[in-house]
Amino acid sequence: KMEAAVADMLKDIDADAFILDCMPNPSPEEITERTQYLVNTIRKYHQGTPIIMIETYMRENGYSDQAVHDRCTRQGEAFVKQYELLKKQGIKDLYLIRDNHAIGTDHEGSVDGTHPNDLGFDRMVEQYQPQIMRILKKYGIK
């Protein structure tokens, strides 16, 4: 959920890249409140290290439950807005991977309408891996 304590812990981790795939759990309001601190803390202690933000995927039950659909949409909008603000502030080496129905729309990619099953995770890998690898390649990371 991008708590400040997690951001403070990440500053001490020596990583080649940071992939932020934490959007399914925080509310849109928490995303707005916490994203800046998380990214700015990572950037302060890890200059030149890529930070890859992954937009939340639409939960399968969001296709039939308007409240879930609206929450997922607002989460994504809040995350993209924070990304854009960070870029305007001049944060370097920051990337955004947008959702493109990551777990599918056929209701086969989830165990419960929310959590991906093996097929859902496989679909996420198919969508995210090529994008992540292109970013990492820019930094000589294989």
How should each PLM-predicted stretch be described?
Residues 21-30, 66-73, 111-119:
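The substrate-binding groove and active-site-proximal loops of carbohydrate-active enzymes
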Residues 43-74, 97-106:
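Active-site segments of SGNH/GDSL-like serine hydrolases
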Residues 40-47, 84, 129, 133, ...:
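Sec-exported extracytoplasmic/periplasmic mature domains
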Residues 112-142:
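Histidine-centered active-site loop/cap adjacent to the catalytic His
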Residues 2-45, 56-63:
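Oxyanion-hole/transition-state-stabilizing segment in secreted/luminal serine hydrolases
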Residues 14-18, 47-51, 91-94:
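Loop/turn elements at helix/coil->beta-strand transitions in domains of secreted/extracellular proteins
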Residues 61-98, 123, 142:
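Substrate-gating cap/lid alpha-helix
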Residues 31, 35, 79, 121:
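Aromatic/hydrophobic pocket-lining residues that form the small-molecule binding cavity
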